[in-house]
Amino acid sequence: VVVRGEKKEALLKLFAAAFETVRPNLEKVFADKPKIVEGMKSFFQTYGGAPVFIVAYAGKSASGQWDTHSTAAALQNLLLAAYAEGLGGVWTDGILVKEPEINALLGIEEKKLVAVVPLGYPDEVPRVPPRRSGRVQWVGFE
């Protein structure tokens, strides 16, 4: 679902409320980095000023299972394609704690919310951090 305008603004209010739900966990994980928690709060309130949100849902497969893997693969491809076109986006799922409210706002029934991707042209492109050595171990193909 592509969301903009008034519904996007209503979603931002839900996202800000979602932050308060996830904040205790973030404060534990980043106990020594409070600026990260405050940065996340700011992001939840604005979603980077993106003009549109992609709200991704999974339906059920013929077997009755949620198609979350297919939705995840589609979102990853969307993010790669967006980057290739100069757009910025980020996969967010902290807002899943507000799924019932998001579904009600968008009129979605019988689908599972997977993620929300804010999408737009970035103000800047961050530098790619250097890779840490020793994080990948090759076992074969020698």
Where are these regions (language model features)?
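Solvent-exposed alpha-helices and their adjacent loops that cap or buttress functional pockets
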Residues: Q45-G48, L105-E110, R131-R132
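Small-aliphatic-rich amphipathic alpha-helix that forms the alpha element of a beta-alpha
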Residues: I54, G59-L105
